[in-house]
Amino acid sequence: MPHFSMHIREEALDGTVEPKLISALTDAVAAVYGEEFGRLVGVDLIGVPQHRRGIGGVPSETDAPLVTLSMREAAYHLPEVPDAPARLVRATTDALAGVLGEDVREQIIVTIVGVPDGRTGVAGTVA
């Protein structure tokens, strides 16, 4: 299951932006893998109070989203989805800039994590 964890300044989460972010991140994966894949996407939005996030050794005044997408490693190497990691980084960045504004684009960090077979589980069973 594709799973996003997004850390963003708490103040950017105002009760209206959260559904937009969840939808946009889901759509980013669906744009790469297809609409059916989108229904599997999980999203966690994690608000970080402004005084608890720093860049360059000082507290940050910017939203600076840090996004991690994790799913099984094999999904990044499917022949029918060439250049999947690059496409996911691009689609995720575009999605976030679309919701948060273009001025945030240069600060968006996207990390793609591949989980090896046998390293995840569902309901107590290795999947």
Task: Tell me the role of every PLM-derived stretch.
Residues 1-127:
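A domain-level signal for the structural core that forms small-molecule/cofactor-binding pockets
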